[in-house]
Amino acid sequence: MKTTTQIVHLLCAFCVVCFCIIQIFMKIRRPNMQELHQEVDEFVPDSCTKKMPKIGISANRNSEFQSCIAEQYVQAVLKAGGAPVLIPVITDIAALTAVVDSLDGLLMSGGADINPLYLNEEPIPQLQDVDTYRDEFDLMLIRLAANRQIPIMGICRGHQLMNAAFGGTLYQDIYSQHNEPVLKHSQKMPRNQASHSVTLEDGRKIGVNSIHHQSVAKLAQEFVETAVAPDGINEGMRHQEKYIFSVQWHPEHLTDDSEPYSLQLFQKLIKYAELYSRAKDLHNRIVTIDSHTDTPMIFPGEFNLGKKEGGKVNLPYMEEGKIDAVFMVAYIPQGKRDDESLDAARNLAINRINEIKRQEKINPSRMGIAYSTEDLLHLKRQNKKAVFIGIENGYALGKNLQNISMFKEMGVSYITLCHNGDNDICDSARGKGEWGGLSPFGKEVVAEMNRLGIMIDLSHAAESTFYDVLECSTAPVIASHSSVRSLCDHPRNLTDEQLKAIARKGGVVQLCLYKGFINKDSEKASLSDAIRHLEYMINLIGIDHVGIGSDFDGDGELIGCRSTNELINITMRLLELGYSDSDIEKIWGGNLLRVMKEVQGERNQVN
């Protein structure tokens, strides 16, 4: 039996060996201040090398409640090509927001059990140590990053916490709560050795390490299982549409050449972070516009765009998603056409426009009302968001051409000629064909809108109306929120011939994100479906005639793109598909602004 002295000597020798290994692992060199300063001062980044994306790593807390992280997380991020940044465990939202705003990607690390109270569950006896303060920190991080569409990767506890944050459930203890016989998931062997297999989404089997007793029970909505253990325990997931994924094992310990999949996980995070970094930079340089939102419709009284008050479009969302401008429309539902009803429709439009304009008064440091391209560019230089004004449904005009001048003076940039029903101007795509296209009054409306420099919006119009307008209008037209009928057979969508006709006229078609116009199975409508519509239009009519008109707050939303802060996901997809910065600039507003300038220039020529 070894004496106490021998044991101490052995421990000291072990510590020396560990210290030497760590020095080699971390490349610690002989201390020399002069050489160190010289190396730093002479370093010049290679202009041909991609910028390293900044990856925030959520810190753990040790027994003394100090923020710390295992070195393997840092080295794995470095090896994959990222610049790791440790995020200390704090719960000051303002400070965390400042940190998250600087990131390109987020890595949620492992650690202790999760407090079940966050999932509205009482603790069971098998629950082990929890750190509720760290839970709060991690959940804040996930929420802040997800709101900004920052790519997120989770590991072990991070995997479980992400599932909980997005609405899934957890086993507090798999050994007592999982119905089937369970493997040993808390290995005693070194973490750089695999202890059991998992089956991946593509059917491959790989070996993984396993250090946990909690796990995902029910996957969060919109997530797909990407790995499963032989006992049925979930080992990995990804969001259907967003750049978010996680695994139950610890791949940071398995990044050698023996199992490439673990390193590939970190490389995936870096790839996604590079896309996000490029998208952020691009949105900062170009002008981004959503050409159709119905936000004023959802508020029964006064509202404040400066707050997140329940809608899908507001200034915080625009700031998070780096969207410069939105068109907010005064939506007027089609009603009766007697004088009293027409007056009521006009007054509703006036009230909604005034409520839009009031937003500038209550948020003067964050936004302004824009009436032209120049206004928008001026606001962007001031770091403010822009709101353009539109009217959805010419029903608001009644039978009086003078109303067009009045709305022009109020700042209206476009008018959608009709909505779901024929009116005194024209036939609707959902109407009864009352006029066979434009009415006589409708032809006067087109001429007057041309004269005043108001864009004509053909979304919702019947095909007969559509072609009548193209024949009568002297200026290009827009479809502020329309999709492709060849991909989703809906009367509101545009045929290939209609798409081509708008392009020939010099106009632009703004892709609508309403799920019923994107996929016949509307509940499955996704960002991927929208990208297919967008690419279809680009291939058919060219990059110069397409844009984005979300229809948010008018039922527009898709899996992967449900509100203004999520629109940057479109940019990331387009970058991933290989579209150039100049192409994306056209899609995000360049094309629409070209048409607006031409239409407003048409007014100047006439006048």
Specify the residue positions occupied by each region the protein language model found.
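N-terminal beta1-alpha1 cap of cysteine-dependent amidohydrolase-like domains
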Residues: 3, 9-13, 18-155, 164, ...
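Proline-centered loop/turn at the N-terminus of a beta-strand
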Residues: 53-54, 83, 151, 169, ...
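Redox-cofactor binding/interface segments in oxidoreductases and associated redox assembly factors
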Residues: 57, 107-108, 328, 417, ...
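Structural motif
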Residues: 80, 109, 148, 165, ...
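Histidine-centered catalytic micro-motifs
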Residues: 208-215, 246-251, 288-295, 412, ...
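N-terminal hydrophobic targeting/anchoring segments and the immediately downstream early-domain regions
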Residues: 278-434, 489-499, 503-548, 552-607
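Divalent metal-binding pocket/active-site signature
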Residues: 396-398, 409-492
